[in-house]
Amino acid sequence: MGQGSLKGKHLLGLQNVSPEEIKLILNVAKKMKKIVLSDDKKVPLLKGKSIVNLFMEPSTRTRSSFELAGKYLGADVINLSPSGSSMGKGESFRDTLLTLSYMGTDAIVMRHSAEGAPLYATKAVDPIIINAGDGAHEHPTQALLDMYSILEKKESIEGLKVVILGDIMHSRVARSNIYGLTKMGAKVHLAGPRTMVYPELEKLGVTVHHDIREAVADADVVNVLRIQLERIHSALYPTNREYARIFGINNDVLKLAKDDVMVMHPGPMNRGLEIAPDVAYSDQSVIQEQVRNGVAVRMAVLYLTIIGGDGSELAY
């Protein structure tokens, strides 16, 4: 993505998105949240436009969030998965993309287990491609909604100590947050087991810790990642009990952070493993608000990439 209007541009990740573009999306998301909170959530901003949610991996939050985002904006939205399409009959990924393109689809929101699948799609077909998570690569809209959630509680992201805790190695959420937060001026700290948080990550402008207490000390934000048990080799991971004891976030550890610390989690949570239930549902937690904010942020992304503008034209 370059600077200026986002109309017609793909959102594949935050690595190549400018701080100005991030600010644009977050500012428009503020207006979209007013729609989300209103009694009449249906607006005609994308009337006549068609969006396909092509999810090759299971999803509850992201797919539902994108579906509601499109429908709230007045678009026609279709959800596709391998089991519910000709992909289940052996149709190739490329042919599926071509079919959707020939039908006149305006945008394809895509989740895929293969890193780089959304980039491939941009070279194969014409519709706007929005990455809803590709392997362990990136998940840009999750990072955008995380930053939006921070800005609702803090005046600015610049200068904040943001701790990302857990399975960094397998986390597309972590990568997008690292790219986005560092561009917005945050001091990003990563923490977790040595098998999941490599020192080489410091090349991205972050600080790496293998002691959770050291990492959380004086933190403004603690973003706890889900332990992706389905992706983890046993050699990389201790027992659940050991992980919870050493790296799980609980009230005892959270006391080391600032008094107004925010606790975040992209979901779904493994309560009692990476995060204690009393922390997940504490006053410091904004986890449920993240879900609501996700709809507003994805509305902003769909509007800006399909229609363009800078938000000043929106009467909300």
Briefly describe each language-model feature range.
Residues 201-278:
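Rossmann-like adenosine-cofactor binding region
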Residues 1-68:
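Positively charged, low-complexity intrinsically disordered leader regions
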Residues 46-51, 158-162, 260:
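Phosphate-coordination loops involved in phosphoryl transfer and adenosine-cofactor binding
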Residues 40-151, 271:
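Phosphate/diphosphate ligand-binding glycine-rich loop within oxidoreductases
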Residues 56-68, 152-225:
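Glycine-rich phosphate/diphosphate-binding loop of Rossmann-like nucleotide-binding domains
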Residues 73, 124-126, 184, 202-204, ...:
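Short, structured coil segments at secondary-structure junctions
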Residues 260-261, 266-316:
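Adenosine-phosphate binding glycine-rich loop
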